[in-house]
Structures are given as C-alpha cells and as structure tokens.
Amino acid sequence: MFMMNTDSHLFLDEPLADALPLYEAKMIHHFDHRWAEYDLEGSVNGLSDATKCDFSYEPRPRYWVERAEVDRRLAAQNWKHKWLIGWRDICRKTDYRTLIAGVIPISAVGDKFQLLLIGLKPSLAAALLGCIS
C-alpha cells in the first residue's frame, strides 16, 4: 500500500487523532498481528506473551498515516472489510518458509507486506489464509 521510500512524506512520527498505524512486515507473523513493535529508539522488539494477553494492546509502529489516505487507497481497490490479508516479503536462506501470511486490522501497510485484496467472503478468505500458511 505504501512504499517506504517514495511515500515517506506521508508518514507521521507521532499519532494524530485520526491516524492509523503503519504495519511493517517485521511486525507480523503467522496468525499474529502483534508479533513485534518498535520501541521509542526505533528498534524492533517482540511482544511478550503477557503483553499479548491484553487484547486491547496495540503494538507501537514506527510511523502512522492519516486515515483519509489509507481509506482513499483502499477505496480505489474497492476494499470494504475492516481487515487485510497479506504475506511478508521474505527470501533469506535462514527462513524455513517462503511465505508468512497474516491478517491485520485496517491500517497503513508498508511495501514488504504484500496485500491480497480479493473479493472473497470472509469465511473463504480465512480458509485461503489457512491453506497458504
């Protein structure tokens, strides 16, 4: 959705009232949209199990994007759901998998998390996610 280099002028360092987090691929893992977060120094850290038990906890991204810009880009794709399915863009010899898929809430998304914006019913989209994971 957002190229991390050419769209960087849209990124906010602090959240505004109507801004959405910018999820990066490194923050997501299998069936876990709260795999990691940025600390205040800009380092990525995994979330503890205790933190993940707090269902209201939202991982801190490095950047935020105004909701209107995210809505505009999703509307251009005719996307009406409150969630996104995608996969991490990975290709390292240390990875056991060539695809790590996940579901995230509506948010801004960096270019290393490839989105799958298809017109399936949510139940079929969930089945597809299970198959590709």
Predicted regions located by residue number:
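Polybasic, glycine- and aromatic-enriched phosphate-binding surface used to engage nucleic acids
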Residues: 1-133
